[in-house]
Swiss-Prot record:
Highest classification ranks of the organism: Viruses, Varidnaviria, Bamfordvirae, Nucleocytoviricota, Megaviricetes
Pfam families assigned: Ank_2
Protein name in UniProt: Putative ankyrin repeat protein L92
Keywords: ANK repeat, Repeat
Organism: Acanthamoeba polyphaga mimivirus (APMV)
Stored Gene3D superfamilies: Ankyrin repeat-containing domain
Intervals holding ANK repeats: 1-28, 32-67, 68-104, 105-134, 137-170, 174-208, 212-242, 246-275
PROSITE patterns given in the database record: ANK_REP_REGION, ANK_REPEAT
Amino acid sequence: MCACKFATYNSNIGAVKLLLDKGADINCMRKDGMSALSAVCKNLDLEFRSDFDTIKLLIERGADVNLTVDGHYTPLMWLIKNLSENDDRFSESKISSIKNLFESDDDDYFFENKRKNKYNALKLLLDNGANIEAKCDGETPLLLACKLSSEITSTKHIKILLKKGAKTNIESNDRKTPLMLLCKNCQQYLENEAVDVLIKYGKANINYQNSIGETALIYLCRISFMSESVQFLLEKGANPNIQDNSGNTALHYAVKRHEFEMVEILLRYNASPEIINKKGKNVFSNMHKISIGVVEQLCRYNINIQLSAAQKYSILQTPSFVNGVKLIGLIESNTKIKTIMDFTINVIPKKVLKIIYHENSLKMKLVKMAWLCRNYSIDKIITMENFWLFDYLNVETIDQLKYKITELTKYES
């Protein structure tokens, strides 16, 4: 280790300055890509202003802000890793003040907090040419920040990266997008705000599909139990009916994993259970593997489930014969109800129109009366059979009758 690098590890800015004045190579580097600047970014201590001053000194003296070797972090990446892993957890009493801080667009106010050294260091690197799209094992600084986002404070440096133009519609070597990584790590409500920032500031496409066709919504339904995050994405406009390269939708995975709450949320946002994947299957195809709870949810949303004889046989071959019988009964009952409902919905308009326009209906009597009023056919208006209508309309004179009839029929063609 060169003397300059040793001095940075020990936060000794005086020693660093002295060594640089004596001609130390500011860009000397170990085989693992660790330079003096990388070392201080990796080990930056929140409590010491001298660490920030050391970074500033190194940059002013000509340190290469992107110096590394293939397969290793740049100084910017080391700093992001430091920010993500070493920030203290916040108590509930501090969350509201952090939220207010996060929402501020005033950069001076944004950094007036106990972590200002770290965030100012991040700004300093970016303002001096740090490559925001540099990659290490397929990860950019933004992907790394989202991957390590388990703390409320991660929202801040994600926002800084986005303001500097970090690309959001990209994927890592393991096919994760920034949005997927953030959603996976959503364990507190402010992480959802980080997702919101990714969409707002980074223009992240919420329906962006990676190389295997997965959206963030499909990814969550395939691997996560966080139904709140699923709902959050749907509220932000995620399409529940997009298919991945296998033809599966988010609902396919949620049903397969028996995630009842996810299934209900997806159905509420119009996820279609009838979409066929590339194996020719929809969510009903493996009905013998679906729990009664999921079927009950599908029935509540008036989904028509048609069972073939083979499917019924498979259900009855499951270990719990009683549950199999119950499942078939539930499906058949729902099918009958839906058939009756569909018939009723189809018949109602025809019946209603027939009733409304029947010659003895109130509507037709009013239309007839309006016609007579316009033609001043008083002898045909004042008849015994029309007395009930006068009482119904509560009129005592012809003028009152004309006014009421005109008002009631003025929108009739």
